Amino acid sequence: MDWNNYLSEEKCPSPPNAHLGVLEGEVWGHWDLSQVPKGTKILSLPTPLKRTKLSYSNWNALRNNDEIEAIKLGYIDEERIDVLSSLPNLKYLQIHCNSQDNIPDLFPLKTLQVLVLAYITRIDNIEFLKRLSNLKTLYICDLNHLYDFSPIAELSGLQELFLSNGGMSGVGKPVKSMEPLSRLLELEYLHFGVTVENRNYDISSLLHLKRLKHLSILPRFLKKGNEEKLKEMLPLLNW
């Protein structure tokens, strides 16, 4: 699969909700990972229910697998990152978990292009994203305690960014600032579904994003002439 422009070309099963749905060809249900069928490109490894007393075994059976392009996980730790870092063609990773208090550094995943984070309700920082130099698409949904997303500013090659921390209950807690966005000069797609503390609706950080083609943002940021300013300063923008 071509993972480029994953959000803008609506390649996810339930656009724009990249954390929902089943990817075409997705394989799951193999607790013994040595039994994953040959030819598997998309592997789903959800966390089993406690009452089933099931767990995954033989993680090392995945090591150096050159066919797997995408993995969905319900839990991630350093051991799993070590195995995933050996997959030469891993382009997509989804982490959906509400039981982890922290996530280890993802830097070893050097080939990663698309990262989807959802329902990670206990984590309050995203330092683990730093140095993902090849990342093109970052999707963050329902990181309820996210306040400072400045580590995103280091993802200089990022082309697509989806930020939402409210879920079904609204827009969630405000973030510290929009300023980190100003350094994402390659950004072409932006969904900014969060508010900024102190009701700060200054959109000047967005005016640096000259490559931006798609923008979805809360209406409150478009008042008092801001919408007109965006149209004037961002010529490629297609509302």
Question: What are the functions of these language-model segments?
Answer:
Residues D2-P104, P108-W239:
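Concave beta-strand-loop units of leucine-rich repeat
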